[in-house]
């Protein structure tokens, strides 16, 4: 396991391209994350510059001198293995998880299937492709339910539903974002998020919001979202949450850094929702918050993440 705080001379990283923006539905969040990461690297003395990953990305990668890349692209095209594959073909080391883990974590259905195969708890679910599927899912799972695109992040396209009519409407709305739509059991209870850095689990964060769930507005826009560190669990339950989150990351093959989202039901049981391989790095973001609780400021955090690109030998 690597030390959390980098001890390298910033010049060892060479010329670093911070990749952000892109074309996914999470572009605006990525722009903010990328700006924060770029500013922190430059302030630390790293020779870093930004690339908005658009149509000219291939040209930029071939024309610029790039010693390594810091990926801050959220969602499709950056978090799903495609950018990782492109960088590997170009021979450019990069931060975070590799191709397989990135692609798997971006696919909520297959991530759940991996967890289920290992006996890790995740809510019961069904795949929706028609109104008939909606009817069948309602009978199998009951209400309330939550509908989500299978390959989106930041809670984009998600909706809580309480009857079949709402389920059909939510499926249609989610289908605008993804050809594959999931519906899951609604877990009533507190939500937690757990950051993992170089295999070490950072202090879990308890989340509270007056919204129906921790949606896009609660994540990035609202001023009334509550973040609890310590998370509010007793020592034994917090340790169980940390162990489960570490196992969830190990199952997917996470490298470097990630964030796991977890619910707790009324009986105290934990349920894995998803794992994010390129979590947000904005002023509202959770990984920087957890890092601060572990004694790392934002600059130390980004250097630690970048350190992994040297250690991993992508």
UniProtKB/Swiss-Prot annotation:
Mg(2+) 2 binds at residues 274, 276. It catalyses: 2 D-alanine + ATP = D-alanyl-D-alanine + ADP + phosphate + H(+). Binds 2 magnesium or manganese ions per subunit. Pathway: Cell wall biogenesis; peptidoglycan biosynthesis. It holds the Pfam family Dala_Dala_lig_N. Cell wall formation. Gene3D superfamilies: 3.40.50.20, ATP-grasp fold, A domain, ATP-grasp fold, B domain. ATP binds at residues 138-193. Its EC number is 6.3.2.4. Mg(2+) 1 binds at residues 261, 274. Keywords: ATP-binding, Cell shape, Cell wall biogenesis/degradation, Cytoplasm, Ligase, Magnesium, Manganese, Metal-binding, Nucleotide-binding, Peptidoglycan synthesis. One of its GO terms (molecular function) is ATP binding. The gene is ddl. PROSITE patterns: ATP_GRASP, DALA_DALA_LIGASE_1, DALA_DALA_LIGASE_2. GO terms for cellular component: cytosol. This is D-alanine--D-alanine ligase. Belongs to the D-alanine--D-alanine ligase family. NCBIfam families: D_ala_D_alaTIGR, PRK01372.1. It comes from Stutzerimonas stutzeri (strain A1501) (Pseudomonas stutzeri). It is found in: Cytoplasm.
